[in-house]
């Protein structure tokens, strides 16, 4: 997500080049539709001053800090437990108006012990942009925790009260009578719930002065609320039911508490995004899994009642198992005109991971780009779905209408990256790339 406001007193990256740079590497994404422009910004292994980009980039957040500069935060979904060169990191880059990188540093270095920061959301608290994200790793030492990073101070607040789980994203929703933060759980297939954290203000939510809740259907379902209970064209009413923090001491206890209150079991929730043009509307992806209620995945539309935010209705917007050309949706971003969807196929042999656009005006779904993995990556992964794009955000307020920022996770290739010391070229890890993408009519 992004914020268009200019922020005074922002903590800027310390490591700068004499002149802004863009990567010399080719784009890891290629267009599939007319008019699409793809501009690689930075590639894993690139050096900007004393900063070197790590691999496996994921969630992004960006805002304008002056008439000529843009601040970008970028997750790196890393963990020593996965044989990565460090634990989770967050890069802080300053870009110019062309998208070139002016400077870079690590806001979170990996020494903090978090694992696998996934998608992310940027929201403003009292005029200051905060970067919200969480661990997609419940077996970490923090058992699947989350953080909110203050861009003005460079310090973060750990937010375990948002739930111990496989976090896909942490999404503050604006325009409601109370603060509500959607917490998307990328959990065990068939046991994935949609959570929220409610409070009087977002600042109080950050500091744990609120209530954790899970979505429970109140409409007609069977004894096990699941995607079998809703199809395209139907609406399922529900409410967010309180879960005491004493039941949030571990992912296992939180799961048990969710089952006890009858929470809806999605197959495997991935990203979520709040629609800034429609207060209370949240789109989220259920990526699907083999031998589950949805195989190719769905996109859901959640309509939260702005005046009574604990009430929300669920609809199926897109269904890959029905007539929609979509395979395992993962990350999402939204503008006034379109919803952008990034695939992450469960089986590499099933095809390239694509960038899809759903246009609200005519309800059309179009593939506009795909990843471009190297032949060696395709061979090692067993198919063209070796690489995935991720982290997409609407960048229209930064670069103009139709512009998006996203990244590619280039698995099955190794590049030189900074190790625990942050010294450039001191380790090897998986690749990746940050890109600007222009998509017409979005």
Question: Where are these predicted regions, by residue range?
Answer:
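Sequence/structural signature of beta-propeller domains
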Residues: 16-442
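Secretory targeting and sorting signals
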Residues: 1-18
